[in-house]
Structures are given as C-alpha cells and as structure tokens.
C-alpha cells in the first residue's frame, strides 16, 4: 500500500458548490506536502491469448436443484479498440433486453429459458469479458446451450437488420443518460478516462459514436 498509493499515482476529483480558487488552495494546503515516491503504476500482465483461445466445458454438479445455470463466453476487447462502439450495439442486439435475439428466439419462441441474455464488459486497460448466460430446466440444458450458440454464430455470420440496429441504438442511448445522472458519476468516469490515458473528450463524443456505429464491421472481430 505504501509503495503504490502515492501522489504521482493518484487523481483527485471534487464536485459540489465551491469556488475553484479556494478549493485549489485548500487541496494544496491539505495534500501538497505529501511526499512523492518513485514507484510507477503496477504493470498488469498481458493475457495469454493462446491459453485464452482454448475452449472447455466446466461442470458443477448439484443434485438439489431443478434448474441449470449456464455461463459461456471469452475474454475480448478494450474500450480503446476501434470497433468498441459497434460491439456495444452488437451485444445489445444479441442479448441486451426484451427485444434481443436471445430473449425472443431462445426464451419467447422456443421456451428454452427462464432467463437469458448477454453482456460485454470491455476493460479500459485490459480485455474485458463477453458473456452469454441464462437458466433453463435440467431436461433442456443441451437445447439451451445449442440455441444460444446458434444465435452467437448467426450474429457473427449475418448482418443485422436496419430495424434491429436502429432499435438497439435508441434503446442504448435512452438508457445511457441514466448512467450519468449526477455530477459524481460524470466526474468518476472522466477520472477513469484520464487515469487510463483516454482522450479528454471521450465521454463527450460517446453518444455520437454509438449513433454512428455500424454493427456489421464490428461483429466479425468479436468471435
């Protein structure tokens, strides 16, 4: 803790009703004397792509349940990747809500799931995780897995429809504003962008890039 939690590795965010000049003076008075160290930010080991590409099936057997809970996915993608915005929309089309392909085709049409969806949590400095998940009856476990895999393969193989693309963009952008409905949330995200070396206007142009995203380009790099 003492080695890495030092002023040169910190970013301080302050929001509220105050005068900037007075706040700067207060911060300097309270924190200016902290001794600077020499320890850089700790390096994060790179992911072993070869090992990550090896697939596997892992089972946890329980005899006291009546449902199967399935998680399938892999490590992929950072927020700095050029196709990040396209993949955000792709994930929403695949499994982001009640109008998604997984929900409509696997749950509503085929009745194979109690719940089903997908998520893609892209990392800022390391690849994130793409995850498709859900729950089903024990007897339909294999059918559920195959149905989800079919939808993942289909969205990687075929272009999405304009209707899906437009609906997903609107849904995502309408919900986006609630992620930043307070000054604290905005400041926290700006600090994270700054800490990881993203452009200062990343958040400012986020919605614009989502609106311009073209899923067919991004889809082919996710699988």
Which residues does each PLM region occupy?
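Non-catalytic, conformational "gating/processing" segments within enzyme and secreted inhibitor domains
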Residues: 1-30
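A common structural junction motif
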Residues: 29-38, 150-160
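Zinc-dependent metallopeptidase catalytic helix centered on the HExxH motif
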Residues: 84-85
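C-terminal, helix-dominated tail/subdomain
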Residues: 190-202, 210
């Amino acid at each position: 803790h003492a080695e890495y939690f030092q002023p040169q590795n910190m970013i301080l965010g302050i929001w509220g009703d105050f005068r900037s000049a007075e706040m700067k003076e207060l911060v300097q008075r309270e924190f200016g004397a902290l001794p600077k160290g020499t320890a850089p930010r700790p390096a994060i080991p790179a992911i072993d792509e070869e090992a990550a590409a090896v697939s596997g099936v892992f089972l946890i057997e329980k005899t006291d349940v009546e449902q199967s809970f399935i998680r399938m996915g892999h490590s992929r993608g950072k927020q700095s990747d050029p196709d990040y915005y396209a993949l955000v929309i792709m994930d929403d089309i695949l499994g982001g809500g009640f109008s998604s392909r997984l929900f409509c085709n696997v749950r509503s049409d085929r009745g194979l799931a109690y719940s089903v969806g997908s998520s893609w949590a892209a990392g800022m400095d390391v690849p994130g995780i793409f995850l498709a998940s859900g729950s089903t009856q024990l007897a339909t476990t294999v059918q559920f897995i195959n149905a989800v895999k079919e939808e993942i393969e289909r969205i990687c193989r075929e272009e999405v429809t304009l209707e899906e693309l437009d609906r997903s963009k609107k849904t995502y952008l309408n919900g986006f504003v609630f992620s930043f409905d307070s000054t604290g949330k905005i400041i926290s995200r700006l600090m994270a962008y700054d800490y990881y070396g993203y452009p200062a206007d990343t958040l400012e142009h986020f919605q614009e890039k989502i609106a311009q995203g073209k899923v067919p380009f991004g889809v082919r790099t996710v699988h």
